[in-house]
Amino acid sequence: ESTKKAARCFYALSQNRADRKRYPAVDPIDSYSKYLEYPEIAEYLNAKVDPQWVEKVNKAKNYILRGKEAYEQINILGDDGVPMEYHNRYWKSELIDFIILQQDAFDAIDSSTPMDRQEFMLNKVLEVCDAPVDFESFEDCSAHYKNIINIMRQMNYSEYKSADFEKYLEQLNTVTRHDN
């Protein structure tokens, strides 16, 4: 707790994430960076990466937080005991976790992600998260997001803008168009 007052950036390692093989095992909720709060940093990132980069990062963080809250309610009340929106929120946070936060250090491509690729992938993930979807059951919701996670993970393992990457991108676009 005292670290939070002094440190501008803090990575909270999580045994739970490590046990679940979610690497790097940095807890996205307990970790923080105060640098995004500095106007000069926000201006720099918004100028160099995307005019709304900081806003998008904060939006992704919010999806993660709301997903954790939904997950806790699902665990307490059961799959059928919560509204479908809770499942949707949870799976959106899982999408961000698997595609943006997790990394395969043993994969030559996924171990290091250039900023232009990070920008593209965050935009695609937020595009999926922001798209209106309607599910009949929590199984349909789960299957929908698992399919998208699988496709986007393959994108993470493919050279950026390569033929394989474009093939997976087209699959993603087909799935998201079909489901909307």
Predicted regions located by residue number:
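C-terminal accessory/interaction regions of large nucleic acid-associated machines
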Residues: 171-180
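P-loop NTPase catalytic core
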Residues: 1-153, 157, 161, 165, ...
